[in-house]
C-alpha cells in the first residue's frame, strides 16, 4: 500500500488520513492495482500515462471516488487523474476502478497540491473540486484549499478555455471561493447568469453530498480559464 505523503507545506487542507480499517478485498487492490494506476511521484507529462487521451481532467479530493469513476466511465477517451489523501477514500476508488474496468483513471494517494505542482503548464482541460473540507470555523479558514496562491497554480496548469467546477454546501465557502477565483484575472464565470443551485446535467451525486452536512443547498460554481 502506498504510504500517504507528508502534508504539503505548513498547513494541510484535509483532516484525518484514515477513519476505519480497510476491508481485506480493498487492501488487496491497494497492494496490487493501485501501484499500476498511480501517478508518478514528481514532474510528469499526463499523456505519458495515456497517450491516446483526447483530454485530461483532474479531480481534487475525490472522496470515495464515485464522482471520479462515473465521469471516467462516461468519458472513456479522457484521462481522469484523481488525488485524495484519505486512505479509505482511495481504497473505495480503486474498487470502483476494478469493478467498472476503467482504463482511463490514474490516482495519487496524497495531497492534490503536489500533483498540481508536478503538472506541466497548460495541460488540463477540466478540474473538479467537489465538496472539499469547508474548515468553516473562522480560525480554520486559512486551511481551506482555495487560497489565492493555489488559484494561481491552477491557472498555470489549465489550458485556455479549460473548465473549473467547485461545489460546496457551505454558503460562506461558496462566497469565499467566488471572491478568490474571480480575483485572479485568469478566471471568469462560465455563465454569469447561471443558477448556482441548479444541479449541472453532468453532475454525479455522491454519498457525502447526500448526507447534507453543510448549511445550505449545494452550490455549483463553474469557471472558465481565460
Swiss-Prot record:
GO terms for molecular function: tRNA (guanine(46)-N7)-methyltransferase activity. It catalyses: guanosine(46) in tRNA + S-adenosyl-L-methionine = N(7)-methylguanosine(46) in tRNA + S-adenosyl-L-homocysteine. Residues 1-22 are annotated as: Disordered. InterPro entries: SAM-dependent_MTases_sf (IPR029063), tRNA_(Gua-N-7)_MeTrfase_Trmb (IPR003358), tRNA_methyltr_TrmB_bact (IPR055361). The gene is trmB. Belongs to the class I-like SAM-binding methyltransferase superfamily. TrmB family. This is tRNA (guanine-N(7)-)-methyltransferase. S-adenosyl-L-methionine binds at residues 59, 84, 111, 133. It comes from Caulobacter vibrioides (strain NA1000 / CB15N) (Caulobacter crescentus). The keyword Metal-binding does not apply. Keywords: Methyltransferase, S-adenosyl-L-methionine, Transferase, tRNA processing. Its EC number is 2.1.1.33. Catalyzes the formation of N(7)-methylguanine at position 46 (m7G46) in tRNA. Substrate binds at residues 137, 169, 206-209. It comes from the Bacteria. Pathway: tRNA modification; N(7)-methylguanine-tRNA biosynthesis. PROSITE patterns: SAM_MT_TRMB. HAMAP family: tRNA_methyltr_TrmB. It holds the Pfam family Methyltransf_4. Residues 139-144 are annotated as: Interaction with RNA.
